[in-house]
Amino acid sequence: MSNYKTVFFTLGILQIILGIFMLIPIFVQFFFNEIDSSFFGASIITIIFGTLFFLSNLDHDKKLNLQQAFLLTALSWLSIAIFGSLPLIFSEVNFSFTNAFFESMSGITTTGSTIIPNLEEMPKAILLWRAILQWLGGIGIIVMAITLMPIMNVGGMQLFKISNSDSSEKILPKSKEIALRLIYIYSGLTALCAMSYKILGMNTFDSITHSMTTIATGGFSNYNESIGFFDSVYIEISAMIFIILGSLPFIAYIKFLNGNRRIFFSDIQIRTFLKIILISILILSIYLFLDKSSELNFRTVLFNVISILTGTGYVNAQFDNWGGFPLIIFIGLMFIGGCAGSTTCGIKIFRFQILYSFVLNQLRKIIYPKGIFVLKYNQSPVDDKFTASIISFIYMYLVIFFAITALLSLTGLDFITSISGAATSISNVGPGLGSTIGPNGNFYQLPDVSKWILSTGMILGRLELFAILVLFLPSFWRS
């Protein structure tokens, strides 16, 4: 176990931090006179376990090798989901372990699926804790995507190694400094979002919790009707702006602050992300114009395209009733996802860009067999091994999606619930389709085994598949 001292030392720190965050809802309990011992007890247990891990591994190696990085990534999310479920289990609401773990995993992976049937009846402390989990999950995935994933060579993420920044730019600071700057930017955007919500009519509690789940593109709300509860076009506009800000690569914010004022216009991933939003809105608007019987309107089209593409999962309408064509568009948007290095999920735009260029080059080679075609991304050549990694990722993404769909159907779920549940879990979106898990539904009525399958899909999708799958290879443990 000495090889893994660094892993458990870091896990100890993360658990102590999580335990400290558990103390925050206690102040809300006092304010709303909902006092119980659930959060205090959960905090003490979490901090004790974290302290034991921390103190028993003080002699750890200061460096983290590749094997340890994979193990730390998987155990971090799993342990936070487990300990994050404790306040729910200890609460007077009496969550079962399955339901509490599902809600916690949905929170920390910023999925946004919920097993709570009546959110309005929940204690404020639990609503705040759900928001905190999503907020922590959002910043956690940003830091991991920028500092760990490129080193781990997962699904083409090595394209975003910090050392590969453009030579015309200043050399970026080291990983620790980058992580701190990311936290400052993330916190600043959250504060701005909260202020905008407050100004536009939300009460203080709602503005704080919704700002946390907006920037994290998580989608947890305090109401069954989600953001539609407020029935405010101005709140929805504010939400869309901050969802988009949370969906951009956070390294771009650092580059912007370092002096690259054109980064948001020059980055091909950002440009494509915005084009997908505009094209999707245009297609659905044309459909809206031609199909007079549709319940669509431009406001709901605009909001739900942005919400679904980014994996946020906020809804302002029951999009189950919009007909088959819009639902096909939305399922496609679920798979596409947002930008790498942001809080969003899905396959990610850069992978589709490279896959498109790869297919285009293959077609050119058919026409010009002797031609030499170099695949490029953001004006830089892309090595064949990166392309192979991306193709492998997309292949496994689809395989796991169909596997989850099949497993869910074996638990007795209907086809629509199974296929949309698989899509929303692996893409970390939140709502599915159908009368049970649709936009204003929840996952409470699903069998426990279905919830465990979906929870597995959530962590697989959040951690880019291979960061989990590699742990099941015997050769990984022998390396």
Please tell me what each predicted stretch does:
Residues 1-479:
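Membrane-proximal intracellular helices of multi-pass ion channels
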